[in-house]
């Protein structure tokens, strides 16, 4: 094999060669393939297709021609990159769902919104649309520069005159090397109005431009949610715009509904969207859809029908579809375009400024071109006028000349004519020698002089030129402008909140004695039959009952306050919904409790921003605090500090108030203080609080509650040895905060220390739990009503080494009330006060009772007589002691 000549071998470092070659390739892709020019909004392939259509005379008034002919001509002359890329680009320009203002008028199958491809180019035909002519208008008047094509045999435009702002009108998308562009389409009327405003006020702000240009206007219409993404994109060139389908909920008879989708987001494949919905229904990720069909047609337009089950919530299903399917998606704006041949990220104003400058250049160059042509014509007419004035001499000179060249030279010398004038005289027909033709030449000459003056005035005054640009843009707006298709919905629709996907319904959340939590619909309880009195049998490790309960909406908030002074927050729907028989899930699986942290209070709240409601806290060491409810509106999953206190202290209870209640604090040594809530100054969320009650040695707070000034409620006291009593709230006079309180029971070895102090109405049941796991349920109304100093009556018999550990209020069984076994709980009423609500807690089948206590009536009567005799003397002694303490 013959060796190559040495001169043809060029040794290069492979690293340098790779670097330079890749950079050359990258720049070629960026500049000559993937990015649009800021002036005409076209990539090279689109520009070449439109120029090829223009050169072939495929205007809207001509018949269609085969797409294969167009593609072949463009590929052969301007774009040697394969026919498929050219045809695909042309197809997209013909799709009214891809281009806001299609630039190609296609005949045949040019694809669909379902992702169907266009027919082969040998079957389809095309021509230019009317608006495309405005992109090419004046292209032959030296308005733009032409460059050589790929082989140097043809000339092609470097940019089109673009008499309307196509970059923003039709948008653009493309992926280059190291960068990409994605520009949304806009409404032509709004765009031209924006350009006009910019031309009148170069210092206009983007906010002012947005008064003319509301936002993108997609060819598939649909909705845009909010303006924040639009504003960010217009200001910085980058942003995310939320797009949503237009859907309505229709009634279809029989109490059933259907969701009808009539517009879908831009660039969404309708067929894939429907497949996604069907997949979610099949996988049971969306429930309640019974039928799904595509009724789209040329007559009705887009129409996707989703039938909804009778018992399903159509609004919730639609919100789920928005979140989980392309019914709602985003358009990522990245406004990169070629500016002076270089890729640049531009904002809205910069895009319009570059376009306006381009139009001024086009109009200026066209004016200069027209001026040159007008002056050339005037020059010819001046020669013809001279010839008509000396017609006999002209004819004689021509007759005497032997050749055309001699005649031309003779005319130039004798009449001081230019070569062009002399040639025009020689070319003049004899019929122009008539008087009528002479008048026409004179009139044309005078018109040309006026026209030349106008053109020179345009070039001499920038404002006159700018006004001409405005007039031409206004004309295009009036001819091609249309109404906005895409509706912009205001109101902060950036994301669907979880509650938008969940039906709002009344629920019950229960927290058990053993810290298991669950939720159930209120309707589940109401459907139950009455259960038996007594206690369901359980193993020792499984003994449990509902210790706290709240009723609320799935969209309401639940605040969990722990013994360590922290607060956690959940939405109602965030608590798992389980069956009635289920014991629930450990509360630590729902909220991230710290070690040794126990829920002390659970409160349901609808509006955490309320300025009229307060939370009152009480700790074991007698500290009390009042804080505005609004301080707890922003609680994260990890919880936050609700009250600060010493290490040896802990939170006992929290109550929600209206700010006008009386506070009741009770201690284990049977002291109780009552003082107005108004004496507590509202403190911050993490504040420590102030002294609520002065504790004697060894004493601690065991209960916190609230009461109205004229309350008919009673104070229930239960002691560790199983004794209890009821005393009217009004037997406890108001005193100053921080006092030692007054006696609420006589503590002896017989009844033991107080374990529970709370308010009751007399309509509740009481659940009493011992340290041995024995549980008893009894009617509060069966507990004797005694004076403050009474010891109370026996509520439960205890064995050796047993004591009462927990007491919980439960709504009593009463035939005349609800015929349901319901538990008392507190929630916020409209006036901000805590109100009693009910929900069933007993199972339908009571099971085997492990302990049922019958109160000995004779023993109780005897105890009562002894206590009544002592009550009066104890009151007198206590009042004297209290007075001395306060002094």
Swiss-Prot record:
GO biological process, one term: DNA topological change
One GO MF term: DNA negative supercoiling activity
Transmembrane segments: none
Motif GyrA-box, residue numbers: 528-534
Cited InterPro entries: GyrA (IPR005743), GyrA/parC_rep (IPR006691), Gyrase/topoIV_suA_C (IPR035516), Topo_IIA-like_dom_sf (IPR013760), Topo_IIA_A/C_ab (IPR013758), Topo_IIA_A_a_sf (IPR013757), Topo_IIA_dom_A (IPR002205), Type_II_DNA_Topoisomerases (IPR050220)
Pfam families to which the protein is assigned, alphabetical: DNA_gyraseA_C, DNA_topoisoIV
Residue intervals of the Topo IIA-type catalytic domain: 35-501
Reaction catalyzed: ATP-dependent breakage, passage and rejoining of double-stranded DNA
Gene Ontology CC entries for this record: chromosome; cytoplasm; DNA topoisomerase type II (double strand cut, ATP-hydrolyzing) complex
Region annotation (Disordered) ranges: 811-865
Subcellular localization, as worded in the UniProt entry: Cytoplasm
Active-site residues, as the UniProt record annotates them: 123
Similarity annotation: Belongs to the type II topoisomerase GyrA/ParC subunit family.
Subunit annotation: Heterotetramer, composed of two GyrA and two GyrB chains. In the heterotetramer, GyrA contains the active site tyrosine that forms a transient covalent intermediate with DNA, while GyrB binds cofactors and catalyzes ATP hydrolysis.
Function: A type II topoisomerase that negatively supercoils closed circular double-stranded (ds) DNA in an ATP-dependent manner to modulate DNA topology and maintain chromosomes in an underwound state. Negative supercoiling favors strand separation, and DNA replication, transcription, recombination and repair, all of which involve strand separation. Also able to catalyze the interconversion of other topological isomers of dsDNA rings, including catenanes and knotted rings. Type II topoisomerases break and join 2 DNA strands simultaneously in an ATP-dependent manner.
Note: Few gyrases are as efficient as E.coli at forming negative supercoils. Not all organisms have 2 type II topoisomerases; in organisms with a single type II topoisomerase this enzyme also has to decatenate newly replicated chromosomes.
Protein name: DNA gyrase subunit A
Name of the gene encoding the protein in the UniProt record: gyrA
């Amino acid at each position: 094999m013959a060796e190559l000549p040495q001169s043809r071998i060029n040794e290069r470092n492979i690293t340098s060669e790779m670097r330079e070659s890749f950079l050359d390739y990258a720049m070629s892709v960026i500049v000559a393939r993937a990015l649009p020019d800021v002036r005409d909004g076209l990539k090279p392939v689109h520009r070449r297709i439109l120029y090829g259509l223009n050169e072939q005379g495929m205007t809207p008034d001509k018949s269609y021609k085969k797409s294969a002919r167009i593609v072949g001509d463009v590929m052969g002359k301007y774009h040697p990159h394969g026919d498929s890329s050219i045809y695909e680009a042309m197809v997209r320009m013909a799709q009214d769902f891809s281009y806001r203002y299609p630039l190609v008028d296609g005949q045949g199958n040019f694809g669909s919104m379902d992702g169907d491809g266009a027919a082969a180019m040998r079957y389809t035909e095309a021509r230019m649309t009317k608006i495309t002519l405005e992109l090419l208008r004046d292209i032959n008047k030296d308005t733009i520069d032409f460059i050589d094509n790929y082989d140097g045999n043809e000339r092609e435009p470097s940019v089109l005159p673009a008499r309307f702002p196509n970059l923003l009108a039709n948008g653009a998308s493309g992926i280059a090397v190291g960068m990409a562009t994605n520009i949304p389409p806009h409404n032509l009327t709004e765009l031209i109005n924006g350009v006009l405003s910019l031309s009148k006020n170069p210092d206009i702000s983007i906010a002012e431009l947005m008064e003319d240009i509301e936002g993108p206007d997609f060819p598939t219409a649909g909705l845009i949610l909010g303006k924040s993404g639009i504003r960010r994109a217009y200001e910085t060139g980058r942003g995310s715009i939320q797009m949503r389908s237009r859907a309505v909920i229709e009634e279809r008879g029989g109490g059933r509904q259907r969701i009808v989708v009539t517009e879908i987001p831009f660039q969404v494949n309708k067929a894939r969207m429907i497949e996604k919905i069907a997949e979610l229904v099949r996988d049971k990720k969306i429930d309640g859809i019974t039928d799904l069909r595509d009724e789209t047609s040329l007559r009705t337009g887009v129409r996707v029908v989703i039938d909804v089950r009778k018992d399903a919530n159509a609004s919730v299903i639609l919100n789920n579809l928005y979140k989980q399917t392309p019914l709602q998606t985003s358009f990522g704006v990245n406004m990169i375009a070629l500016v002076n041949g270089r890729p640049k990220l531009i904002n809205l104003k910069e895009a319009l400024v570059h376009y306006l400058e381009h139009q001024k250049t086009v109009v200026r160059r066209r004016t200069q071109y027209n001026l040159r042509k007008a002056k050339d014509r005037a020059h010819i007419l001046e020669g013809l006028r001279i010839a008509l004035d000396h017609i006999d001499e002209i004819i004689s000179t021509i007759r005497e000349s032997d050749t055309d060249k001699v005649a031309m030279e003779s005319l130039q010398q004798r009449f001081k004519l230019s070569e062009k004038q002399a040639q025009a005289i020689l070319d003049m027909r004899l019929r122009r020698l008539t008087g009528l033709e002479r008048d026409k030449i004179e009139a044309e000459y005078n018109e040309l002089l006026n026209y030349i003056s106008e053109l020179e005035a345009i070039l001499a005054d920038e404002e006159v030129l700018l006004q001409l640009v405005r007039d031409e843009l206004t004309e295009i707006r009036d001819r091609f402008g249309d109404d906005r298709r895409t509706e912009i919905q205001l109101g902060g629709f950036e994301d669907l909140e979880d509650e938008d996907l969940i039906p709002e319904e009344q629920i019950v959340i229960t927290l058990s004695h053993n810290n298991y939590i669950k939720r159930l619909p209120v309707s589940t309880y109401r459907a139950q039959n009455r259960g038996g009195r007594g206690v369901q049998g359980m193993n020792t490790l499984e003994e449990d009952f509902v210790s706290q309960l709240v009723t609320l909406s799935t969209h309401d908030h639940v605040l969990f306050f722990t013994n360590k002074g922290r607060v956690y927050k959940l939405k109602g729907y965030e608590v798992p919904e389980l069956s009635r028989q289920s014991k629930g899930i450990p509360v630590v699986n729902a909220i991230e409790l710290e070690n040794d942290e126990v829920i002390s209070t659970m409160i349901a709240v609808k509006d955490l921003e309320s300025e009229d409601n307060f939370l009152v806290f009480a700790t074991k060491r007698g500290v009390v605090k009042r804080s505005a409810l609004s301080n707890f509106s922003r609680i994260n999953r990890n919880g936050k500090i609700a009250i600060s206190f010493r290490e040896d202290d802990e939170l006992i209870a929290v109550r929600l108030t209206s700010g006008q209640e009386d506070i009741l604090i009770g201690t284990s040594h049977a002291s109780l203080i009552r003082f107005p809530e108004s004496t507590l100054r509202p403190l911050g969320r993490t504040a420590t609080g102030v002294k609520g009650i002065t504790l004697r040695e060894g004493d601690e707070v065991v209960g916190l509650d609230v009461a109205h000034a004229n309350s008919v409620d009673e104070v229930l006291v239960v002691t560790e040895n199983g004794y209890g009593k009821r005393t009217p709230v009004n037997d406890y006079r108001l005193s100053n905060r921080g006092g030692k309180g007054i006696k609420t029971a006589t503590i002896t070895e017989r009844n033991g220390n107080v374990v529970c102090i709370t308010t009751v109405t007399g309509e509740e049941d009481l659940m009493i739990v011992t340290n041995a796991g024995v549980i008893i349920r009894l009617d509060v109304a069966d507990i004797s009503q005694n004076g403050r100093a009474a010891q109370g009556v026996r509520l439960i018999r205890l064995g050796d080494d047993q004591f009462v550990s927990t007491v919980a209020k439960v709504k009593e069984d009463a035939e005349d009330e609800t015929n349901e076994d319901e538990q008392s709980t507190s929630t916020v009423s409209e006036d901000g006060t805590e109100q009693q609500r009910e929900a069933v807690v007993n199972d339908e089948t009571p099971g085997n009772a492990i302990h049922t206590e019958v109160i000995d009536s004779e023993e109780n009567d005897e105890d009562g007589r002894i206590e009544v005799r002592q009550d009066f003397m104890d009151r007198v002694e206590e009042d004297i002691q209290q007075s001395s303490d306060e002094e």
